[in-house]
Amino acid sequence: MIVKTRAVVLREIKYRDQSKICTLFTSEFGKLTAILKGGRNPKSRLSGKFSAGNVLDIVLYKKNGRDIQLISDGSLLFSPLSAEPDMERFATMYRIIDLISQALEGEEKNLPLFSLLTGVLEILYSTEERFELLFIWFLLRMISTLGFEPSLDRCVYSGEPLSAAAETMMLRELSFVMNPGGVALPAAALRQISQQHSITMPAYRLLSELSSTPLSALDEVDAGKAETEFLCKLLQEYCRLHLDHTPRNRNLAVVAQMLSK
């Protein structure tokens, strides 16, 4: 059966002399594996189009029950190479597609997650800075879409409004609880044994603001470097815990190598 769908390339590996096998996240069929015959041949009209992070409209020969589908055609929509080369942009891209790959279970359609991914990648490939802030914004929406959104407005234990309580008690920090996910007042968190991290009030306010800021207004957010870096690490850890397995070493090694240069 010949089908058309939009797709994001999550991974590509060499196959034989000139072909490649791609892991794709598609709008219509979820995550699937497909072969691009002759895709590494420089003379092929599809050469270079099916690279990690690229977003395309594709044509597949799809057969139910077959493990590997066949790519027939593809039209590139946007790519990390469409902007000036930037190692931080590539590092952010690999973080995003790695987490998406972990979150997907086979050929299960997930249009909200697909729309989130393509929307964020389009912005990522067209912006020149604040990649980490965009990554935090993405993480918050991804965990919400997947159903493990942390409680940010009220204490995850007592239910008290966090901002009002923090102001009344003149708190300098709160606690971010990994499971159940959410932010807690220090007094309530002390009585629990769950894994948790201290979060400063500036970091909490940034987290809360990003949770309600639309993507179109992200440039208006005032974010400190320390708070941004902290939230990146915190939310990645939170995602890994709730996705119930660790990131693929291959993509994380690529990220580490990029950021060290």
Swiss-Prot record:
Belongs to the RecO family. This is DNA repair protein RecO. GO terms for biological process: DNA recombination; double-strand break repair. The keyword RNA-binding does not apply. HAMAP family: RecO. Coiled coil: none annotated. Involved in DNA repair and RecF pathway recombination. InterPro entries: ARFGAP/RecO, DNA_rep/recomb_RecO_N, NA-bd_OB-fold, RecO, RecO_C. GO terms for cellular component: bacterial nucleoid. Keywords: DNA damage, DNA recombination, DNA repair. It comes from Chlorobium limicola (strain DSM 245 / NBRC 103803 / 6330). The lineage of its organism: Bacteria, Pseudomonadati, Chlorobiota, Chlorobiia, Chlorobiales.
